[in-house]
Amino acid sequence: MADITAALVKELRERTGAGMMDCKKALTEANGDIELAIENMRKSGAIKAAKKAGNVAADGVIKTRIEGNFGVILEVNCQTDFVAKDAGFQAFADKVLDAAFAGKITDVDVLKAQFEEERVALVAKIGENINIRRVASLEGDVLGSYLHGARIGVLISATAADEELVKQLAMHVAASKPEFVKPEDVSAEVVAKEYQVQLDIAMQSGKPKEIAEKMVEGRMKKFTGEVSLTGQPFVIDPSKTVGQLLKEKNADVTSFIRFEVGEGIEKAETDFAAEVAAMSKQS
């Protein structure tokens, strides 16, 4: 067995752009022969995957699965909506979802490690960066889910609710994007931050501090209602809030999870003219 030195790993990294562990593994399998390691990495798609790793993957799909009192929601990213509809990409996402559900896996790093070889092979085949971004689960008395075009997904847990009500509530969460279940669930940190913003706005109007503070109290009540599920007007019947609807039905919502494809990912704006100019210089 050849000695796999740090210098050898460094050289392979520089030549392929692959990660340190991938390079070490390739060198070990090639018994220290760097040329053979490169050839094997090319065959496996590892080099192509490494080159694609820096590409922003902000498109993709949301997948959900519920059985009984357990549900899972997953986001898998790619770079374009075209690939998001690809049968191979969809099959990969379904396979990851099945594994997450079967193993009740909520640590995305565990899923990434489990599916890294398949991900690398798919990147080589499709030609886009692919990323298992996040996974979460819910348990509860009554679970519901809703998918809006595979780009927005919701899992929701309720008590004393029928299937139709839970579906409607999941649709509401998808459309109205609440951040909390109830106004009292809004964290102290979020409340303090918004209070200061509203106080600054009120003070800028020239009002005395005492009056400004009273104005802000009213605004804060409105704010906590707007960001909480039960405080929002129900999308199907805006004449009542979700809280009023739940009271009528003697039901309650315990928790929900909402995923939207690419949310929070900064997608670089492409200057097409500059890109063409750069490509012409390379050719």
Curated annotation (Swiss-Prot):
An example Gene Ontology CC term for this record: cytoplasm
Keywords: Cytoplasm, Elongation factor, Protein biosynthesis
One Pfam match: EF_TS
GO molecular function: translation elongation factor activity
Locations listed in the record: Cytoplasm
Main localisation: cytoplasm
Keyword field contains Hydrolase: no
Region entry Involved in Mg(2+) ion dislocation from EF-Tu, spans: 80-83
Highest rank taxon of the organism: Bacteria
InterPro entries for this protein: EF-Ts_dimer_sf, Transl_elong_EFTs/EF1B, Transl_elong_EFTs/EF1B_dimer, Transl_elong_Ts_CS, UBA-like_sf
Role, per record: Associates with the EF-Tu.GDP complex and induces the exchange of GDP to GTP. It remains bound to the aminoacyl-tRNA.EF-Tu.GTP complex up to the GTP hydrolysis stage on the ribosome.
Homology family: Belongs to the EF-Ts family.
Annotated protein name in UniProt: Elongation factor Ts
Organism classification: Bacteria, Pseudomonadati, Pseudomonadota, Gammaproteobacteria, Enterobacterales
Gene: tsf
